[in-house]
Amino acid sequence: RIYLDTCCLNRPFDNQADARIHLETEAIRTILDLCEQGQWELLDSEVLALEICQTPNLLRQKYITLLLAPAIMTIQLTDIIINQAKLFESLGIKAFDALHMACAIANADVLLTVDDKFLKKAQSIDTHPLRVAHPLRWLEETLYDFYS
């Protein structure tokens, strides 16, 4: 089960002339395609919906929402998730990122992000079982393992 944070979902709208951004976008599109084909399971959350609604461009909002169409479930905010997020926030994770982590912990195998600061900070916290990874690296490792 895969949880993409909002940075991943917004990546297709970033400057594709930048090689890194282009590669990350292709990885994210591949992951979404494989979820749509049923090879992997995509997760959505109330936190993602809230963050997407804050996007000023309505067309972008609609497109991002469509990217989440293959999601098999929407993770609801609960007191447990909010308390877990507060713990992550106390460890230096930003509020929305902490909520994404807390949503993903009980439901996902991996949380993917292109936010380098969040990725580094989340990987440094060893009090949770969740794998937080970069989509390009994760896709490469996962496909390599699958085809080996």
Predicted regions and their residues:
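Acidic, PIN/NYN-like endoribonuclease modules and their adjacent C-terminal/linker elements
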Residues: 1, 15-25, 34, 90, ...
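PIN/NYN-family metal-dependent endoribonuclease catalytic core
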Residues: 3-56, 69, 74, 136-143
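Short beta-strand scaffold positions
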Residues: 4, 76, 95-98, 113
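Alpha-helix capping/helix-boundary segments
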Residues: 8, 48, 81, 99-100, ...
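Short, basic, glycine/proline-bearing loop/turn elements
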Residues: 14-17, 79-89
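Short, aromatic/basic amphipathic alpha-helical patches
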Residues: 58-66, 120-126
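Helix-adjacent hinge/juxtasegments
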Residues: 61-85
